Amino acid sequence: APKNDREINKNSRCSLNFPYLLLQVLYRKLGRKINGKINDFFKPNNLLSIFEEYLPFKGSKVNKEDIKDFMEMLVRARLALDICFIRPTEYGYSLDMNLNEDNESLKNLLMLQSMLYVSSSNYTNYRWFNWLMDEVERYGLPDVNLLYSSLKKKMDNESPLPEYKALTYSGDNRYWFWRLDFYIWQHRKELFHKDSPEMTIVENYVFKRNRSIEHIAPQTP
């Protein structure tokens, strides 16, 4: 999808809405160990019952220190999402990191994070969220190149390249189409002439959450 308007920072929003942010922070506080299925845990409709089970806020089982710890984690997470992770906008994504938006390293991180974001769901966002928070809790505001390398390494370890025969339209793994788009963007200067129409397309590419492989494939430059 082309960036038709450069006002990419206008009306940006957090990558996680508040109910999902609460659940992500709770999941991290619990050491990613829960009872039952993860799909049931990450359902906003179950928010109150989940907190009543894992972090009681009323009655005799209330632990004030646990609640205080959770609130501190919540503040850190929200700051991390505002500064160190992409924020969706009307035209694409913005990324702060206290750097100029023309910084090449920032662009690399933005594209990697946007690929991770669109290829995740409400039930798998915990992967990139915890990868991010590991770095933030270790370094505070991570170096942009260090954060990029860390996220990419964890992505590669989490999703190693499958065998060639598995990468076909007969499968239903949209992830690898997004990943291919990321690699094309990453190696664009090697693949396309700088003044070619193809380079213009790749330079302005924006990752989108598409619902079908048929929708994704034609977007690949």
Identify what each model region corresponds to.
Residues A1-P221:
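Flexible coil/loop and intrinsically disordered segments
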